[in-house]
Curated annotation (Swiss-Prot):
Induction summary: Unlike CRH11, CRH12 is down-regulated during cell wall regeneration. Also regulated by NRG1, TUP1, and RIM101.
Known function: Dual chitinase/transglycosylase that plays a role in cell wall architecture. Chitinase and transglycosylase activities are coupled. Required for the polysaccharide cross-linking at the septa and the cell wall. More specifically, transfers chitin to 1,6-beta-glucan in the cell wall. Plays an important role in fungal pathogenesis via its functions in cell wall assembly and regeneration, filamentation, and adherence to host cells.
Positions annotated as glycosylated: N34, N161, N407, N416, N425
Example GO BP: fungal-type cell wall organization
Protein name per its UniProtKB record: Crh-like protein CRH12
Similarity section: Belongs to the glycosyl hydrolase 16 family. CRH1 subfamily.
Binding site for chitin: E143, K221, W225, T234
Compositional bias of kind Polar residues: 316-329
Keyword Lipoprotein: yes
Length: 504
């Protein structure tokens, strides 16, 4: 009798233990590493009134070959599609669910970025390298179309504003970006962004353009992705839908160089607990000379278009390798004259690595004002083609009004800044939709204002995000659970008591 009862209790105990998973927080499909909420953990100060960001600053120059791994980047999705080797970093798509990507652990506030890239060949496959801020400023260094062997795109976005289709420029090149490595780079300063192909400038974007320039710290990202079958606009832009039976598709990256023009430990900005807005500050250092502060969120809706907004300050430079000039915002077929900036020494080729590793200061400034020397320089004629259909005018975000507390000094020293020095009172926040502009049509993704939950075990590439009382503060689900231990102990104790009672 007792033996039968004991056998029953043992079987019951086994059944109870089998019902507990190894990790209660583990998803049903643990093998799928393609989807990641890695970037979803970042809060947007222009969208979330409880968001105050403190981003890790680079504050120096770095070089990575990617031959033996990476010190400054984290894999954010499709781990199986990321490899390091003699040709540097390789991102590979094997099926429609793959999207291999890496994000830097640091941010820069103005500077130089350059990498050697060989794009992935394949219809509907896009090789991309870009910079992006927490509040959705963005500079697309390059987007390479797998279906187009002689063209690449440059682009930019300000605070997620993609209501017009006139930001992208398309550059022809020879030889193909799909058959061999080419250097793609940008130099970002407060008044000018210059895109480079093989050490030669191919596009220059000045502050007077109607959209403005990025004014927030940005991280770097490499990504290889395929267009979705049900997105007709993106399919047309990418040259067709991907055929995965023709894969795998591989993008190669090597010899990355990055220089942060600002010097700091962290970059902080966003919403304070009392509802005030904290302008960008460089903790433990200073912001680059000439920095233009972003407007607080409450000012965005008050901006009105001005005649100055119509100034075309975006020029595509022709070269022997690229005879076709990309689409611009004017419908006038005539040509305009462009005077190269006088600060030509800031557009020379990159220093050798030995020089890069020194502490020599490099201003990288671009003087956009005409000078006597400029009058002696040759004039480059820039043809202007027809604009894209559907282009509409939109109020500018970063250049319509002067910053309320802009520091006019040469260098904005922030070491001993007081809390109220660069603060604006704000009571509203902006809900921003991230809409990616394409060649034909647009793809829209709405970012939710709620704090997402993460199941990713990757190290996050950003430093600190503040959540205030009343908000959900749990960002990550713990990989170690005490539920199983507690439940197991309770069952064991109960079984022991039953056995003791039966034996007495």
């Amino acid at each position: 009798m007792y033996k039968q009862i004991l056998t029953f209790l043992i079987l019951f105990l086994r059944y109870i233990l089998s019902e507990f998973p190894d990790d209660p927080y583990e998803d049903d499909d643990t093998s799928d590493d393609n989807n990641s909420d890695y970037e979803g953990q970042k809060c947007n100060p222009y969208r979330d009134k409880a968001c105050l960001v403190n981003d890790e600053a680079l504050g120096k120059k770095i070089f990575e070959s990617f031959a033996e791994g990476t010190k400054y980047f984290t894999i954010t999705s499709s781990t199986r599609g990321v490899r390091f080797g003699s040709e540097g970093l390789a991102l590979t798509i094997q099926d429609e669910f793959d999207n291999p990507a890496l994000v830097s652990s640091f941010y820069i506030m103005y500077g130089k970025v350059e990498a050697e890239i060989k794009g992935a060949a394949g219809k509907g496959i896009i090789s991309s390298f870009y910079l992006q801020s927490d509040d959705l400023d963005e500079i697309d260094v390059v987007e390479i179309f797998g279906s187009d062997p002689y063209e690449f795109q440059t682009n930019f976005f300000i605070k997620g504003n993609t209501t017009t289709y006139d930001r992208g420029r398309y550059h022809e090149m020879h030889p193909s970006p799909l058959s061999e490595f080419h250097k793609y780079g940008i130099e970002w300063s407060p008044d000018l962004i210059t895109w480079y192909l093989d050490d030669k400038p191919v596009r220059m974007l000045g502050r007077r353009n109607k959209h403005g320039l990025p004014c927030s710290p940005m991280f770097l990202k490499f990504s290889l992705w395929s267009v979705e079958d049900d997105d007709e606009g993106t399919i047309a832009w990418a040259g067709g839908a991907a055929s995965f039976s023709e894969g795998p598709f591989t993008m190669h990256i090597k010899n990355l160089k990055v220089q942060d023009y600002s010097k700091a430990l962290t970059y902080s900005y966003g919403n304070l607990r009392d509802g005030n807005w904290l302008d960008l500050r460089a903790d433990g250092g200073y912001l680059y000379e000439g920095h233009k502060y972003c407007l607080p969120p409450k000012m965005l809706d008050k901006l009105k278009p001005t005649p100055k907004q119509e100034t075309d300050d975006d020029q595509v430079l022709t070269s022997s390798k690229s005879q076709r000039v990309a689409t611009t915002i004017s419908e006038d077929k005539n040509t305009v004259s462009y005077y190269p900036p006088s600060a030509t020494n800031s557009h020379t080729t990159w220093d050798r690595l030995s020089e890069w590793e020194t502490e020599q200061d490099e201003t990288g400034t671009d003087d956009t004002e005409n000078s006597d020397n400029e009058e002696e320089e040759s004039i480059t004629a820039i043809p202007i083609s027809k604009s894209r259909k559907g282009s509409t005018r939109r109020l500018d975000i970063s250049t319509q009004l002067p910053p309320l507390s802009q520091n006019e000094s040469k260098i904005a020293e922030i070491k001993n800044i007081t809390t109220t020095k660069h603060i604006h009172n704000t009571t509203t926040s902006l809900q921003i939709s991230k809409i990616k502009s394409k060649k034909v049509g647009v793809t829209t993704t709405i970012y939710s204002s709620s704090t997402p939950q993460s199941t990713s075990k990757s190290r996050m590439p950003y430093n600190i995000f503040f959540n205030y009382p009343g908000k959900e503060n749990s960002r990550f689900k713990s990989g170690v659970s005490s539920i199983l231990a507690t439940s197991f102990s309770s069952v064991v104790i109960a079984e022991i008591l039953v056995i003791v009672v039966l034996l007495l």
